[in-house]
Design a protein with these regions (language model features):
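DNA polymerase processivity clamps
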Residues: 1-103, 122-244
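Conserved active-site/ligand-binding neighborhood in enzyme cores
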Residues: 108-113, 132-136
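Long, charge-dense
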Residues: 110-124
Length: 244
């Protein structure tokens, strides 16, 4: 299989080291990975076709370690499972024209169960995410350094349209902040809601090459972020920060 497919799937859930332990579910050459951050502030799912591994459910306990193995491989990688006599997957092998690598799999009982998200019937605001949005957010976050939150709200424009207003920076009045806007659709309005900035930045960086991106926000404090990139669908549910 194409190494790029494998690394893209890893990027979508690993989020630069934010998520380590996951269960891979492979069926009919399609992989589905559900995941949750250790802080429980983000739940997500990555789905990719063209994943050349037999139908199975396997535990990847240390994605950092697995990623290091994948990185040294050539562009085409052959994945195979080694199983016990009872058919339990024990290890995954990776092979190219240089290396034969073995990665031992985790007991699935050691992988945290990912909860289902109770989505609202409709969201209160919706906006597209493009490369400009991603660039503005990541540049602002880098400029401000170790800020922990960003807020979103909607705002009426001069021509009676709606903008989504994103403010990156801490909540107190004396903190440095950076604000930018993007067009949005909002039926009933959206008052200011705080979300974790670090996790949002990693989500955007992991999907900076996406051809399709969308953000949907519920006033109840849930943000849904979805992307499509080269056939890979990734969905993230970000939970609001509690009021200080």
């Amino acid at each position: 299989m194409n190494k790029q497919t494998l690394t893209s799937v890893l990027d979508k859930y690993y989020l630069n080291g934010t998520v380590e332990s996951v269960k891979w579910v492979i069926k009919d050459k399609t992989i589905t990975v559900d995941f949750i951050t250790p802080m429980k502030n983000l739940v997500g799912k990555a789905i990719s076709p063209n994943f050349d591994l037999e139908d199975s459910e396997i535990g990847i306990y240390n994605t950092s370690q697995f990623y290091k193995l994948v990185k040294i491989m050539n562009d085409t990688v052959v994945l195979k499972l080694n199983k016990s006599e009872r058919g339990t997957p024990l290890e995954i092998t990776l092979a190219d024209n240089q290396y034969d690598l073995n990665y031992y799999l985790s007991d699935l009982n050691l992988i945290e169960t990912v909860p289902s998200i109770n989505e609202p019937s409709s969201y209160d605001a919706e906006a597209n995410i493009d490369s400009d949005f991603i660039s503005k957010f990541t540049n602002a976050k880098k400029a401000l350094g170790d800020v922990k939150q960003f807020t979103v709200k909607d705002e009426l424009t001069d021509d009676k349209m709606k903008d989504l207003v994103i403010v990156i920076g801490e909540g107190n009045g004396y903190a440095n902040k950076i604000k930018f806007k993007t067009p949005c659709e909002s039926m009933f309005g959206l008052t200011e809601i705080p979300f974790p900035a670090d996790v949002m930045m990693e989500v955007l960086k992991a999907n900076e090459d996406a051809t399709n991106g969308k953000i949907q926000i519920s006033q109840e404090g849930l943000m849904k972020i979805s992307f499509t990139e080269d056939g890979i669908d990734s969905i993230y549910y970000l939970v609001r920060l509690s009021d200080q």
